[in-house]
Amino acid sequence: MTELQQIIEAAFERRDSITPGSVDAATKSAILQTIDLLDAGKARVAEKIAGEWVVHQWLKKAVLLYFRINDNGIIKGDDAQYYDKVPLKFSDYTAEQFKEAGVRVVPPATARKGSFIAPNTVLMPSYVNIGAFVDEGTMVDTWATVGSCAQIGKNVHLSGGVGIGGVLEPLQANPTIIEDNCFIGARSEVVEGVIVEEGSVISMGVFIGQSTRIYDRETGEIHYGRVPAGSVVVSGSLPSKCGKYSLYAAVIVKKVDAKTRAKVGINALLRSIDE
């Protein structure tokens, strides 16, 4: 455990007594350093280690403490003013800093301080919350939302209106994770710490939480909380045991590998679900 982590862990135990006016200098410095690490992508709330996702709960604690040490203040926008505890990530960026970051930010896209946006990423008018990690080559399309501490992989496309759930409380909950080379269709929602594994394609209007049944029509398996790698997923339903009604489910209609994805467009994969 690093010294920074030790300070954060100790401060979190007494978090109810921490205010902007009472926080000691060492604790405040540790919190601000941690937020800077998240902001720069030098630390991330979750990372894949030896093939398994590991969540660093102390970083989530630092984010929660960051709210405790900040007063609300005016945040200026182009046409409006805002009142919040967390500053905006790009509010003081110069043209040179944007070039160095390699990020394109289309107005009125918003990213909060403490989120990381990797090079070669495009933010259309969208929202990226504190603690989130958006990796290289990703498109966050119009009105998409990347929730607090969510992890978005390389070369991901979050289509218009997509919602990727955030998670700060309860503290033990895992962040929502979209792995590399995934496509999330318009107006879909992935929440509650669900993991969409590498190379998956989620069709338009699919809603997946921890209780959502994810049915593989080829094998008959039902998954919860995880979309297996290379899945093509559409909205569907499964019959009840009594046969009197059906309930919503996400349906894996096929599996694809990287070679197939390279040769066949996303639309072709989704249009051929009955083959």
Curated annotation (Swiss-Prot):
Catalytic activity: (S)-2,3,4,5-tetrahydrodipicolinate + succinyl-CoA + H2O = (S)-2-succinylamino-6-oxoheptanedioate + CoA
Binding locations of substrate: 104, 141
One GO CC annotation: cytoplasm
Coiled coil: none
Enzyme Commission number, as recorded: 2.3.1.117
UniProt cross-references to Gene3D superfamilies, sorted A to Z: Hexapeptide repeat proteins, Tetrahydrodipicolinate-N-succinyltransferase, N-terminal domain
TM helices/strands, residue ranges: none
Localization in the cell: Cytoplasm
Annotated keywords: Acyltransferase, Amino-acid biosynthesis, Cytoplasm, Diaminopimelate biosynthesis, Lysine biosynthesis, Repeat, Transferase
UniProt enzyme class: transferase
Keyword Ion transport: no
GO biological process, one term: diaminopimelate biosynthetic process
Classification via Pfam families: Hexapep_2 (PF14602), THDPS_N_2 (PF14805)
Pathway terms, separated by semicolons: Amino-acid biosynthesis; L-lysine biosynthesis via DAP pathway; LL-2,6-diaminopimelate from (S)-tetrahydrodipicolinate (succinylase route): step 1/3
Self-association state and partner proteins as the record states: Homotrimer.
Family as reported in the entry's similarity comment: Belongs to the transferase hexapeptide repeat family.
The protein's name in its UniProt record: 2,3,4,5-tetrahydropyridine-2,6-dicarboxylate N-succinyltransferase
Organism for this UniProt entry: Aeromonas salmonicida (strain A449)
